[in-house]
Amino acid sequence: MRILDYCRALSQTSLVALLAFAGISSASGVDLKVKRVQLDNGLTVLLHENTQSPTVACRLFYATGSVHEKQGSTGLAHMLEHMLFKGTQKVGITDSVQDGKFLAQEDNLQKLIRGAEVKGDTLSLKGYKARHDSILEEHRKLFVKDELWEAYLKAGGTGLNAYTTDLVTAYFVTLPRNKVELFFWLESDRMQNAVLREFYPERDVVREERRMRYDDSPTGRYFETLEATFYEAFPYRNPTIGYPSEIMHLTREKAAEHYRKYYKPNNAILVLAGDFKADSLMPLIQKYFATVPRGEDFEPITQQEPEQVGEKRLVVRRSDSKPRVDILFHTPGVPNPDLFALDIMESVLNGRAGRLYRRLVEKEQVAVSTDAGNAVKKYYSSFELEAILQEGQTPEKAEALLWEELERLKKEPVSERELQKVRNQLYASKASALADMESVASMLAYYEIYGDYTLVNRWLEEVSKVTPAQVQAVAQKYFQKKLQTVGWFIPAEK
């Protein structure tokens, strides 16, 4: 598993992986027919018709994630994702008026609880918490538990879920073609009428999720710290789930502010891929979404990652470690022509037939597995290498062998035969992938957020143009020891 994939989940997808979702019509490019419409309120709609299955993959992506969080509020975007399943003014509640009164009481008690915690007033704290729990218990009598989930399931929905990355918060489900209107109704309602019920109990759930995935995981803190080492200033350094102390200081008020700012049609992308006629669906999309008010335009992210001035190293020792070596390099964000050559290098190095596996696993028997990834993103990207060590092998040797393969890319042009083999692999992966409408829908949403969904129809052509000389030049440009960030996760010293 790639390091940044671990820490940022789905956000760290390479161009190769993203475009493996798409089919190809020829050896020169992808031919994905997409209709793009933008409503007057700014909502972007992408529609791809495919009749192979009587279903429609539905996606609603908001261009907001951990990079948009204020200092001291890491985990807020992820927390809000959880809250969007608690219902709206119409969904999940039997009495919206009483609902509002209970929420106000709970918010007031939380302020008293925070004040007592600051003062160290344990007696008052105990009383406030008991009162809060009592009010919440009464409040829950008004809830219609999991009403949104049940509505989708009763309509034949599958794959209902959501996720948060550093760049997006995504909500998705696949529905029978005659039930897509339900998606429009529920999601347009969530876009403007969400009610953040049970915020503080859910905050405890998220804190426990963090403990299991990071704090108690042998590699969790290592990956988190490595990423914070790799990024000096840009908010990609922060974990999407948030830091423990900051999670526990998130408030319903902060989450509501984030919701009101970013959950707006002009910051959202609606994608449908499957069995429908675009001309028939557009009136329904207009009906449910066109009346949602446009949000205020907010300032783009201006924070920049400073140029790396020297090699960085992180060594983490644990008694329960599975030894590994990771090397990371900064690369440009989308769009940049160097990314196509880096995609080629990923394929040259990666896989059981790739150079890293053949060298470190089969020949030298230093590692049990290897990986290489061109982790492409908006703003900044990274190229990553990893080796999971054989028992008794040293990180010094593994790192040296990884560097020998990088130096080989820098000094020796990739042969035309090897380059054509990589191209053939990429062509083959595209030829069958168009069958997955769920992946096609997600791919289109990501590329639109990256700035241009049409890249899916140009990527293969661009990769086909990459020459051995270009691969060599790009390798020389980015793979420098003074620009590397190295991580060792090794056993504790006895």
Which residue stretches match the model-derived regions?
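M16 family metallopeptidases and their MPP-like homologs
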Residues: 48, 53-69, 76-77, 93-189, ...
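N-terminal secretory signal peptides that target proteins for export/translocation
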Residues: 1-9
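An aromatic/glycine/proline-enriched structural segment found at the starts
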Residues: 190-198, 207, 211-215, 230-241, ...
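Proteolytic maturation boundary segments
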Residues: 4, 25-47, 269, 277-317, ...
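Bacterial N-terminal signal peptides
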Residues: 11-23
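Active-site recognition of the HExxH zinc-binding catalytic motif
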Residues: 74-86
